C-alpha cells in the first residue's frame, strides 16, 4: 500500500456511507494521532487501540446524530499524497469551510489541527481536511 492515510480516510468514508457504527483499520502511529484529533474535535464517538499481532488495529466508533441519523463527518479529503506533498506556513494556513472545518497537519511538533499550528506559529504538511 503506497498511501496508508488515504486508505484510512477511505475506510472511514465507506463506513459512513454504509451507515456502519464501528470501523476497524490497521494501526500506525500517524493514524493513532489523526484518530485522537478526530475524537477531541467531536467527529467520532470513541476509539480503541487493539494490540493484536505486530501492527495492531484501531476500532473507531462513528458519531451519528440521533434525530437525523446523519454522521458528524460530512467530508474527508486527503490533501498531501506521497507523490505530491503539500506544505503550508503558518501565515498561509488553509481555512476549511471558512473555519468551520479543520485541516490536520503533520508538523515538527507532532500532528495537530490548523488552528493549533497557527497559534504555535509553525507550518507543516497538510494531511487532510475534515468537516
How would you label these PLM feature ranges?
Residues 1-131:
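Core subunits and conserved enzymes of cellular information-processing
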